[in-house]
Amino acid sequence: MGEMTAIRDAYGAALKELGEQDVRIVGLEADVASSTKSGIFGSAFPERYFNVGISELNMVAMAAGLARTGFIPFVNTFAVFLTTRGADPVQSLIAYDSLNVKLCGAYCGLSDSYDGASHQAITD
């Protein structure tokens, strides 16, 4: 049996690898680069990586705009904030127009017990 790897470490490495293969891939994150490991991509491609701060709604809207101009955005945040704060623009700006945006929610369900109830995605 091979060595076990944390999902977030595998995700960060895979995102970096995808970025090496396609210059259209951009990363957006809500001040969670170390938690989601999306910062691995950001370190490799700082010109294609945007930390928007704790602003999921705006991050999703930015991703929609980037997708409309030919980029392939990967949106990175905790699942609970993506499915609550980011829900409206996901529906109205991305889903209705079938835009090519990748929504990556880390720590789904009760998996983030350390950070408490505010970070537990029981509605995702």
Model-predicted segments: where are they?
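Thiamine diphosphate
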Residues: 1-124
